[in-house]
Amino acid sequence: MSQPNTAAQFAASVVSETPEKKGGKINLLDLNRKQMRQFFIDMGEKPFRADQVMKWIYHYCYDDFEQMTDINKILRAKLQQVAEIRAPEVAEEQRSADGTIKWAITVGDQQVETVYIPEDDRATLCVSSQVGCALECKFCSTAQQGFNRNLRVSEIIGQVWRAAKIIGSLKSSGRRPITNVVMMGMGEPLLNLNNVVPAMEIMMDDFGFGLSKRRVTLSTSGVVPALDKLGDMIDVALAISLHAPTDDVRDDIVPINRKYNIEQFLAGVRRYLTKSNANQGRVTVEYVMLDHINDSVEQAHQLAECLKETPSKINLIPWNPFPGAPYGRSSNSRIDRFAKVLMEYGFTTIVRKTRGDDIDAACGQLAGDVIDRTKRTLKKRQAGEPIQIRSV
């Protein structure tokens, strides 16, 4: 068998090494409703039992079959023998002055990061899809950690379950329940579709977390073939990590652009929009503002021209620094000038408020604890380049 020749191909080829069963028991968090119903049918039970169990798991965040009082004792005993509800554990919690909470979540012998962001009218959970990331975007902390593996369904939906359980226990303190989930944490979701899609199905299932498809957002840096596949698998809100209006700049800061350039990426986005109701006809464009790299007035005009055939809402993101990064954050005046140009073209343009940067929980700062399998960190050491080491 030929070996993957790029980091992204390597990531796509790696399946989770976490076993499906622990101690001979299947983790029910790995199953969407269709799979859960088949599980109960195989046990000789009626498929509606799946709906009952899912409701206990996701509506009430129960992980003990004995608490499921509308299930008879015989079935509860059978479930204890063959199944479990095992979400990843929190290794550490950090709280920001602005109310943001970041959790280091243990997955096997490594850690990913999950962030809860409360606002006046919503509470968003930022969820990771991989241990590390293979795409090597230069302005992103996660990319500097290298890549190890894809997360399983249970490790993705388990982040939501764990956060919902914690937030539920904090209701007396006024914490808003999770209303939105964004797949914008560690990793490239489109390189882990086989696990990300079932997890998003559970997020939107009435017997799961019951979120509207407009409140579940997947963000991608531009894996175009997988984006086409996504459109045939599920309908969720789409955000794209564009970050540059021209290929010469994007080739440097988002290296996957060398394989799928801006024109190809946006064509894929338009194909997705024709299949999607969740997006209401337009995509959210994420654009990190890097001082004197991608933030000139000329580049604002270029971005507007670039997006003229792709209905878009644009989020301008002040860059969030991390140790060893070669960039600076654009000044407020440069960001304001950039936004003004885009609005003059008629684009809805928002300058995203930085949240959680005092605990390294802001956009682009998530790092976790990753055992790199791409040799990226080894190459940096050999070249004498700085390596960001995070202790969580």
UniProtKB/Swiss-Prot annotation:
Localization, UniProt: Cytoplasm
Keyword field contains rRNA processing: yes
GO MF: 4 iron, 4 sulfur cluster binding; metal ion binding; rRNA (adenine(2503)-C2-)-methyltransferase activity; rRNA binding; tRNA (adenine(37)-C2)-methyltransferase activity; tRNA binding
Gene Ontology BP annotations: rRNA base methylation; tRNA methylation
Cofactor: [4Fe-4S] cluster
Gene3D superfamilies hit by this protein: 1.10.150.530, Aldolase class I (3.20.20.70)
Catalytic activity, EC: 2.1.1.192
All copies of domain Radical SAM core, residue ranges: 119-358
Residues reported to bind [4Fe-4S] cluster: C133, C137, C140
PROSITE patterns assigned: RADICAL_SAM
Catalytic-site annotation from UniProt: E113 (proton acceptor), C363 (s-methylcysteine intermediate)
Cofactor details (free text): Binds 1 [4Fe-4S] cluster. The cluster is coordinated with 3 cysteines and an exchangeable S-adenosyl-L-methionine.
GO cellular component terms attached to this protein's record: cytoplasm
Residues annotated to bind S-adenosyl-L-methionine: G187, E188, S219, S241, L242, H243, N320
NCBIfam families according to UniProt: PRK11194.1, rRNA_mod_RlmN
Protein name: Dual-specificity RNA methyltransferase RlmN
Organism taxonomic ancestry: Bacteria, Pseudomonadati, Pseudomonadota, Gammaproteobacteria, Enterobacterales
Record gene name: rlmN
